[in-house]
A protein has these predicted regions:
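Short, solvent-exposed alpha-helical "recognition" segments
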Residues: 4, 35-60
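Short, amphipathic alpha-helical "recognition" segments used to contact nucleic acids or chromatin
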Residues: 5-21
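Short alpha-helical "recognition helix" segments of helix-turn-helix
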Residues: 26-27
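Basic- and hydrophobic-enriched, low-structure N-terminal and domain-boundary segments
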Residues: 51-124, 128-135, 395
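Phosphate-binding and hydrolysis-coupling loops of NTP-dependent motor/remodeling domains
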Residues: 62-84, 419-459
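P-loop NTPase motor domains
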Residues: 96, 132-372, 427-442
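Conserved P-loop NTPase motor cores
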Residues: 102-134, 310-423, 453
């Protein structure tokens, strides 16, 4: 016979938590699951309850194992009214308490960092969740930039509520090119064109594994010479303000080096050009491409910008993404530290490099200071590096196979009490569509993500 958790029990849990009683002891004393205690603990930690009480009830099956209790609640979710303080970004309804769950990425709230990681198999609701989250961010005046590799965020297939409330702007970079120059110098380039040359060569080397030490050196020198020919010289800082050449100029520079019979490195130059030639075939970075100004993005006051990359060759997708992120980093660092301004949403994380020195790694480590957050999404835990796992304060885990229990172990190590490793493992492999196991503030809880159409009345 199932029994309902009374308001008195909920208040008792909160009182015992404030007195420092361990979650396991509270659960045993009150006859509830440690997961339910952990869910309430998360809200207490985030200051989510007002002085009133939480109006909700949920079932407790006395004879079932904890993991069965968790999963059985998934089938009993009904809309509940909550008195929870409306702070942060609404995610959805907590299946163990009935309260609304919020993600609070804002540094002023004490968040470790604003970054979030989303993982789950195909068809479990990742795209819909991202749409809901960025639309919610837009209502708070926070802009988002989505890098779309598979047209999952195409406006042709977007729900009308997304079009109305997210006010999306679509940029067809793969089809029309984009008016951004990877040779642009930024204030953090303290060595001017030398920094630009190193950045370009490093990016190509990360993406094209065939580029070795010699090819890297030739590529770097080619960029330095190209910038010098455009009157941007390392030894003269006044020239660093000059307009840089457009990216296709690098192709001409490498061709000249490879055709110069007196150049001892002509074969290396030809080899480099053969590896990166696809970049120039598509000519994505061009003066006549679609205009994207980061200043306009930062000042848009609640919009979603979608950069369409579908149709580009796989390696070129990575190159374009890295150069765009470096350009974005240059802009945000030029205006200095500040409050949270925007999020970069990177789907299909297997297309990204998390190596030391990559733009993604830099944003994960330093984005908080400059007011930019990352939302990383992919189908498999293996697509994320240890840097990504350790530098994303919030994780949304949808149904995932987790055959080697890698993600279950990583999650259980981060939690303070609450669900056990076995509960987590069983739960994340059986979650229904649209339901995620969320890890934040060292607490794990299960949330039914609220779709855009079900949020409108709260805006």
């Amino acid at each position: 016979m199932a029994k309902k958790l009374s308001e008195g029990q909920k208040l008792k849990i909160r009182d015992m938590l404030r007195q420092g009683v361990e979650s396991k002891a509270i659960a045993e004393h009150l006859g509830v699951t440690s997961g339910q205690v952990a869910a309430i603990s998360a809200h207490v930690t985030m200051g989510s309850y007002d002085k009133g009480q939480t109006k909700t009830d949920f079932d407790l099956a006395e004879e079932e194992p904890p993991s069965s209790k968790i999963l059985s609640n998934l089938e009993q979710i009904e809309p509940q009214k909550s008195n929870k303080v409306n702070s942060g970004i609404l995610l959805g309804e907590n299946i163990e308490t009935g309260d609304d769950d919020y993600w609070d990425p804002f540094p002023e709230s004490g968040s470790t960092n604003p970054h979030a990681l989303i993982v789950g198999e195909s068809g479990v609701g990742k795209t819909e969740t991202i749409r809901s989250v960025v639309t919610e961010l837009a209502q708070k005046g926070i802009n988002s930039i989505i890098f779309d590799y598979g047209q999952g965020f195409s406006l042709d297939d977007a729900p009308p509520e997304f079009l109305e409330y997210a006010r999306p702007v679509e940029i067809h970079a793969s089809r029309d090119g984009i008016n951004i120059n990877p040779f642009q110098l930024f204030p953090f380039d303290i060595n001017g064109p030398l920094n630009v040359a190193q950045r370009v060569a490093d990016t190509f080397q990360r993406v094209y594994s065939q580029i070795g030490v010699q090819q890297h050196a030739v590529l770097r020198q080619a960029v330095i010479e190209l910038l010098s020919d455009s009157e941007i010289k390392a030894e003269n800082e006044e020239t660093w303000q000059n307009d840089p050449p457009w990216f296709h100029g690098l192709q001409n520079q490498l061709e000249q080096l490879s055709n110069d019979g007196g150049n001892p490195q002509r074969r290396i130059a030809a080899n480099v050009l053969s590896h990166i030639s696809t970049v120039f075939v598509f000519n994505t970075f061009r003066e006549g491409g679609e205009k994207l100004t980061w200043k306009d993005v930062a000042e848009a006051d609640g919009k979603v910008f979608i950069i369409q990359l579908k149709g580009l060759e796989h390696s070129l997708e990575r190159v374009v993404t890295e150069f765009l992120l470096w350009n974005l980093i240059g802009f945000i660092e030029s205006i200095g530290p500040g409050p949270l301004k925007c999020f970069a949403v990177l789907d299909e994380a297997h297309k990204l490099a998390f190596d030391a020195g990559s733009p993604v790694e830099k944003l994960l480590r330093e984005g908080r200071k400059f007011g930019i957050g990352l939302i990383l999404a992919s189908q498999q835990p293996e697509d994320f590096s240890s840097v990504a796992f350790s530098n994303t304060a919030t994780k949304l885990i949808f149904q995932v196979a987790d055959e080697d229990s890698k993600i279950s172990r990583q999650i259980s190590r981060k939690l303070r009490g609450g669900h056990s490793f076995e509960e987590i493992r069983q739960t994340i492999t059986k979650l229904p569509r649209g339901v995620a196991y969320i890890v934040s503030e060292n607490t794990g809880y299960i949330t039914k993500i609220r779709q855009i159409k079900d949020r409108i009345n709260s805006w």
